Structures are given as C-alpha cells and as structure tokens.
Amino acid sequence: MKQKLDRLLVQADIQLTERQKEQLIGFVHLLHKWNKAYNLTSVRDPEEMLVKHIMDSLVVSVHLQGQSFIDVGTGPGLPGIPLAIANPDKQFVLLDSLGKRITFIKQVLRELAITNVTPVLSRVEQYTARQFDGVLSRAFASLDDMLNWCYALPNDSGKFYALKGVYDGTELQAVQKPIKLVDAIKLNVPQLVGERHLIVLAK
C-alpha cells in the first residue's frame, strides 16, 4: 500500500513526509477495520480507499487559504483527516451528527497521534460555537443545501469549499443565499474515474 500511495502522490505532485504517509496508511487501515462493523463507507477495498478517499481529499490541500477549517458532515473524517495530516499547521473541526462516526474519528486521532483536529458531535444547524477561515464539505447534495446550513460558519474573509463531481454552473443558479463564485477548479485525482471539482464560494 505504501508503494501505491507513493505513486499516487507523485502523480498528484504532492510532497509529504514519511510520518504523514504512515498516518494516511494508518487511517486507511483503521477505516477498513472499523467499516466492517460500523458501515462508515461504501468503499470496501483499502487500495480503492487510497484513491477515492485519501487522494480525493488531499488534492484540495493546495487550494486552502487560512488556518482554521470546519469539515461539515465529515462522515468518517473525509476530507478532514487527510487534510489535517497534510497540514499540521492548520486547525480542523470535524462535525457530524452520527455518534459512531465521531467515536471512530476520536479513535483515529488517538491511534495516529493527530493533534490538530477537534471532533464535534452536532447537527450543523445547531453548531454556532465559532467562525472559520474555511468551510469544507463533500457531503451535501447541492450547493444550496450547503449554504442554507452553513452560511454563518465562515468569518468575514472566510470561504466555502465544496467538493463536487461534474460541475456545469447550473447548480449555482439555484442558490438562494447571496454568494459569489471565487473559483471552480477541476481537480486531478490520480486513477479516479469521473470528474471532480472544487467549488470555492464567498459571501
């Protein structure tokens, strides 16, 4: 698995330390192990997880601006855990409303000694503790849903980062909240079939 991760990182032009690579592989092993009982992801094969979960998250890293981020509807920690491993200088809050997912994330943080992540069990509409430089999500079906639930979470200069598949601009036209498109970035995820986009929005 280490060799495959090394190849994927080279293809994506991402540089990580050996320690960071070990943490990413450790995360995949834990996700695979816990998935059998907790049903955390539909992806069953660990090597497939490297592409569909790890690389799909890591390619966002270069586009993040700021120091504080919240991953809304993080599920088993995606994209938050890979991004936190790749960016130990940034702080991440991982928010989910399902207890089993937060329990899993807490175990990951303990076993892999990740210190820049705060897991929070909450529904997004009930979380008002603070604001962030960036609001991350790959969980929402539509940009309109994301903005309806998360509109108060970015600070004055903060941005929304939505991970999407195919993007043609029509989804943005359905958004009710006042918002501006900062960028629509086509992502290169090595060995992933299908399009991926990062939609960056600001109030």
UniProtKB/Swiss-Prot annotation:
Chain positions recorded as S-adenosyl-L-methionine binding sites: G73, L78, V124, E125, R138
Keywords, sorted A to Z: Cytoplasm, Methyltransferase, rRNA processing, S-adenosyl-L-methionine, Transferase
Organism for this UniProt entry: Haemophilus ducreyi (strain 35000HP / ATCC 700724)
Record protein name field: Ribosomal RNA small subunit methyltransferase G
Location (main, coarse): cytoplasm
Family to which this protein belongs: Belongs to the methyltransferase superfamily. RNA methyltransferase RsmG family.
Known function: Specifically methylates the N7 position of guanine in position 527 of 16S rRNA.
Organism placement in taxonomy: Bacteria, Pseudomonadati, Pseudomonadota, Gammaproteobacteria, Pasteurellales
Matching InterPro entries: rRNA_ssu_MeTfrase_G (IPR003682), SAM-dependent_MTases_sf (IPR029063)
Localization of this protein: Cytoplasm
A Pfam family reported for this protein in Swiss-Prot or TrEMBL: GidB
Its EC number(s): 2.1.1.170
GO molecular function, one term: rRNA (guanine-N7-)-methyltransferase activity
Reaction(s) catalysed by this chain's protein: guanosine(527) in 16S rRNA + S-adenosyl-L-methionine = N(7)-methylguanosine(527) in 16S rRNA + S-adenosyl-L-homocysteine
One GO CC term on file: cytosol
